[in-house]
Design a protein with these regions (language model features):
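Carbohydrate-active catalytic/glycan-binding domains of CAZyme proteins
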Residues: 1-239
Length: 239
């Protein structure tokens, strides 16, 4: 978790045959692994009017950081961004996306590239904005996301999005909001992932400490801790 290797660009909008002819706009993606294949999910618009033509594309590879080939996009999803794919212990995969206060989720077929039924709204999320992430801890499902917080904090700096979470007994809810687990960074919005590595849980997020510009963000990671009742402690952001 200290020494990292930059493997370079793994996908470009020029490789997306159904994408907007002007290219660009490949925003926050996700990647899942199943049966020897890595599935890379990315939001990309298909038309010049990019704001209303988002699709969730799928590219696959047998390696995690190279060789990805675009296979198409998932049909039947609303034009939203920020895909998240969660594979449960029984092998069933779920996909989520959202933005603008809307969060939806649904089952994926075994091929990981088609919906198994309809996407449905995720009920019970308090002040949802974007950046869905789902993980499982002690038999419970956790859905984390960035909120719409936009108030001043005690340091006088314009407030940015906080990271919230909700808990459920089902990967598709209904969800019970549990509050905030990360205060704002300096990059306006935030997009977090919660993962376990060698017995320790970590919170991945981003800030703009290196660039000084809230649209040029760097990946950060800090340890994450649960309370005995399953709630998440506020993550301490380190430098």
């Amino acid at each position: 978790m200290v020494h990292w290797t930059d493997h370079g660009e793994i996908l470009n909008s020029s490789q997306v045959p159904w994408g907007r002819k002007e290219g660009g706009f490949m925003w926050a993606p996700d990647c899942a692994y199943k049966n020897g294949t890595y599935y890379f999910y990315f939001p990309h618009p298909s038309e010049t009017n990019w704001d209303n033509s988002w699709k969730i594309g799928v590219a696959t590879s047998c390696r995690p950081a190279e060789g990805f080939e675009v296979k198409g996009y998932i049909e039947g999803m609303d034009p939203l961004i920020d895909p998240c794919v969660f594979v449960d212990d029984n092998g069933q995969a779920y996909i989520y996306n959202g933005g603008g206060g809307i969060c939806k989720g649904g089952k994926l077929k075994d091929n990981m590239m088609e919906l198994d039924g309809l996407m449905q709204p995720m009920e019970g999320l308090e002040d949802f904005h974007e950046a869905t992430w789902v993980h499982k801890y002690n038999g419970k499902y956790y859905l984390s996301y960035s909120d719409n917080h936009d108030e001043n904090w005690n340091d006088g700096v314009k407030g940015d999005n906080r990271m919230r979470y909700a808990v459920s007994d089902s990967p598709l809810g209904p969800w019970e909001s549990k509050g905030i687990y990360m205060e704002p960074t300096d990059s306006y919005t935030n997009h977090g992932s919660i993962v376990e590595f060698k017995g320790q849980w970590y919170s991945f997020y981003h800030n703009s400490a290196l660039s000084g510009h809230d649209w040029l963000r760097s990946i950060c990671v800090d340890k994450l801790y649960y309370n005995p009742d399953g709630t998440i402690q506020i993550v301490k952001q380190t430098k």
